[in-house]
Design a protein with these regions (language model features):
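Short conserved segment of the HATPase_c
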Residues: 77-90
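Acidic ATP/Mg2+-coordinating residue in the GHKL
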Residues: 72
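Conserved catalytic submotifs in the C-terminal HATPase_c
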Residues: 21-31, 63
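Short beta-strand/loop element within the Bergerat-fold HATPase_c
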Residues: 54-64
């Protein structure tokens, strides 16, 4: 069991030269494999910063889940591509750009890690007009 806020805060500190805003509910603890979870969150942050200039992370607790939102202000991903980008090595030509570094594994690895924790990842349009990654984990 780990304090989710501590984990997120420590990860975000590694990106001190980047624009990342966090808004975390207090006292969120969750069962996690710490190193795997850190890798997942870093993949999501790296993805957001690769395509946008700003990332926002916030958390919300429901009756049965903890939800982590990772928003960016990049070009987003068309809804018809949401399932495809979860596949290993899948890259989008137009909306996110082939000129970016990466091989198309970040979202796939993050998805696998969250699923192994009993949760799921979904993609939506962000209020920042980019991509919102919604991570839902059981309490």
């Amino acid at each position: 069991t780990a304090n989710l806020n501590d984990v997120i805060t420590k990860i975000v500190e590694k990106y001190q030269d980047k624009k990342i805003n966090i808004n975390l509910e207090e006292n969120l603890t969750i069962n996690m494999r710490l190193n795997s979870f850190k890798r997942c969150l870093m993949n999501l942050i790296d993805n957001g910063l690769s395509y946008g200039k700003k990332v926002e992370i916030f958390t919300k607790k429901t009756l049965s889940n903890i939800i982590i939102f990772v928003d960016d202000d990049g070009p987003g991903i068309p809804e018809k591509e949401h399932q495809n980008v979860m596949k290993p090595f899948y890259r989008i030509d137009k909306s996110r750009g082939q000129n970016k570094a990466g091989v198309g594994l970040g979202l796939s690895i993050a998805n696998d890690i969250i699923r192994s924790h009993g949760g799921n990842i979904s993609l939506e349009k962000s209020p920042l007009n980019g991509l919102r990654v919604k991570v839902s984990l059981p309490l």
